[in-house]
Every structure is written in C-alpha cells, then in structure tokens.
Amino acid sequence: MLVLLAGLFVVHIATAIMLFVSTIANVWMVADGIDSSIGLWKNCTSGSCDGSLSYGNDDAIKAVQAFMILSIIFSIISLVVFVFQLFTMEKGNRFFLSGSTMLVCWLCILIGVSIYTHHYAHSEGNFFPSSHQGYCFILTWICFCFSFIIGILYMVLRKK
C-alpha cells in the first residue's frame, strides 16, 4: 500500500509539472517546414517569441488560458490536500477530498483542451498553411488521462 501511495504521489507531481510545462510553453501548434510555433500566449518565429497572438483578444483563447491555469491550481491543491490527509486522516478512510479536487482538475483540462481543439487546432485561417499539433497539446492530453486516473484512484484507495 505504501508503494502504491508513493507511486501515486510521484505520478501526481509529474502531472502537475507537465501541466505547468504545457501551459507555459508556446508549442501548441507547429508549422511544417519553417521554425515557427503558436502557443496559448505568444507566436514564436525563428526562436524569438515576441509576437502576440493574432486572436489574443478572442474569448475562446482566454477561456483556454483560464481553464489551464485553473487545472494547475486544482492539481496543486489536490496534492497538498492528499499530503494533509495522509498524515491527519484516520485509518480506513478514503481520500475523497483529494480525489474530488483532482477530478475538478481533470474537468478543467477537458474543458480547456476541448475549446482549443474546437476553435484553433483545425482552423487553417489562424495558422500556417501546413501545421500540426505541438508537444504542449499532446502533453495536455496526457495530463488529462493521468489526472482522471489519479482522481479515481484517490477516491477508491483507503488509508491503511
């Protein structure tokens, strides 16, 4: 049981770090053939991330930014609550609070990435003629899976 909780703790920390990276880095869409990428915050061309987003004032991108930041916040809160419950909770109880907080993180990731996918991932007008999803987009979907698994495991596990 201790090994399972330690492994869950490590995966939770890795998920929080991946959420930070995917939200901060500007590689959500990458242009084919030229050294350019587009993120949630800036356009990057030839290693310089000076350009602001052409659609930076759109409500959809602001919603994606907000939900990704909320997912980071809920992931960290869930981690702190898990550690707190680990040391203060009586034996036999379940980690409901940390599990439900992590599932809220999962929901924020789902909403944010779904909005981005709907509005920007397949829109040819906003991006380069030929582009593909960058590592941040893929990393966010990986965090989506991990946060769901972690949230469910927190809800199922009992402290022994």
Swiss-Prot record:
Write down the Gene3D superfamilies for this protein, in alphabetical order.
1.20.140.150
Q: How does it sit in the membrane?
A: Multi-pass membrane protein
Main location as per UniProt? membrane
Give the domain of life.
Answer: Eukaryota
Could you identify this protein by its name? Epithelial membrane protein 1
Q: Where is the signal peptide?
A: none
Please state which protein family the record places this protein in.
Belongs to the PMP-22/EMP/MP20 family.
Query: GO CC terms for this protein?
Result: plasma membrane
- InterPro entries hit by this protein: EMP_1 (IPR003932), PMP-22/EMP/MP20-like (IPR050579), PMP22/EMP/MP20/Claudin (IPR004031), PMP22_EMP_MP20 (IPR004032)
A biological process (GO) of this protein is: bleb assembly
Q: Where in the cell is it found?
A: Membrane
Which PROSITE patterns does the entry mention?
PMP22_1, PMP22_2
Report TM segments: 1-21, 67-87, 95-115, 137-157
Q: Which keywords are on file for this protein?
A: Glycoprotein, Membrane, Transmembrane, Transmembrane helix
Keyword Iron on entry: no
Tissue occurrence: Most prominently found in the gastrointestinal tract, skin, lung, and brain but not in liver.
**What positions does the record give for glycosylation?**
43
